[in-house]
Design a protein with these regions (language model features):
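Anion-recognition interface
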Residues: 1-289
């Protein structure tokens, strides 16, 4: 069974689905049988043991790199009070380093306010049983699911990872600069392929495909509506299902609160990475880069 040589460790909602779909096409890569194996962060997966984990990787006689991408791995500095609520193991970086100390690590980071909003929307999209609902304020959502905020504390979590792995083990990509713009994607993949030790000239298909496209507000309203509400919503003609009236209100106060949490962290991250990030207001714009 092949042992991993690289990991994509996050962040959540920062382009990792697209990145893994590109990496998995490379003929020299043995990828996991699915994108996110959650071995190091979910207790029931961890309990299956190393043999189970390594059995999840495809056999590839030409494989030079073996790995998977679970965005939750970046969140290694976890407040103990969150562990049971989030079903998340502590000290992921230490667990990974204890088993595979020579790994190459790929990190994708997105403006933390935008990432938090996207993470919140993703939980809402999954349905009522996940504890959030459409129109909930950011602060209320964060009180119910602390990971919405905590997973955006990049400096704190990367610092923990860098206690276990040398700087040269990390390739850090910025979503708004390296992943979202179509013009940047080919160069980004060359850097990734070089970092994990496979031929950088490979060109995967679907380079500009969109992954994890956001559900229309109409579809989310149908998911949360009662029986009578669903019947009424189904009378809305398809041409009007994207109408702004069906969208959920913005939460500028909540975004400003997130910014007050994250702004000092962004400055710490810049110091840690030795580069300036143009995340200088509550939301990032692609043309900032």
């Amino acid at each position: 069974m092949p042992a991993p040589t690289f990991l994509g460790i996050g962040a959540q909602k920062a382009g990792t689905t697209w990145l893994f779909s590109m990496i998995a096409q490379h003929p020299e890569v043995c990828s996991g049988n699915r994108k996110e194996l959650h071995y190091f962060n979910i207790p029931r997966r961890w309990s299956k043991g190393r043999e189970w984990y390594e059995a999840q990787f495809t056999e590839n006689p030409t494989g030079r790199a073996v790995g998977e991408c679970t965005p939750a791995y970046l969140w290694t500095d976890v407040d103990p009070s969150y562990l049971d609520r989030e079903k998340h193991l502590p000290d992921i970086a230490g667990r990974v380093a204890g088993m595979y100390p020579g790994l190459r690590l790929v990190v994708c980071l997105r403006h933390p306010v935008s990432r938090a909003r996207s993470a919140m929307n993703e939980i809402v999209k999954k349905g009522p049983r996940f504890g959030l609902r459409p129109g909930l304020s950011i602060r209320e959502a964060a009180s119910r699911r602390p990971s919405i905020v905590e997973k955006g504390r990049y400096a704190v979590n990367l610092t923990e990872w860098m206690k276990h792995f040398p700087r040269e083990a990390f390739l850090v990509l910025i979503y708004e600069r390296d992943i979202l713009p179509d013009a940047a994607k080919a160069a980004t993949l060359r850097r990734v392929f070089e970092h994990i030790g496979v031929a950088p000239s490979f060109q995967p298909v679907g380079l500009t495909d969109r992954k994890n496209v956001r559900l229309k507000p109409y579809d989310i309203r149908v998911r949360y509506a009662g029986r009578i509400g669903r019947r009424a919503l189904k009378l809305v003609p398809p041409a009007f299902q994207d109408h702004p009236a069906l969208d959920f209100p913005d939460d500028p106060e909540g975004e400003q609160w997130l910014w007050s949490v994250y702004e000092p962290e962004i400055r710490d991250l810049e110091d840690l990475l030795g580069q300036r990030l143009l995340w200088n207001r509550p939301r990032a714009e692609v043309h900032d880069y």
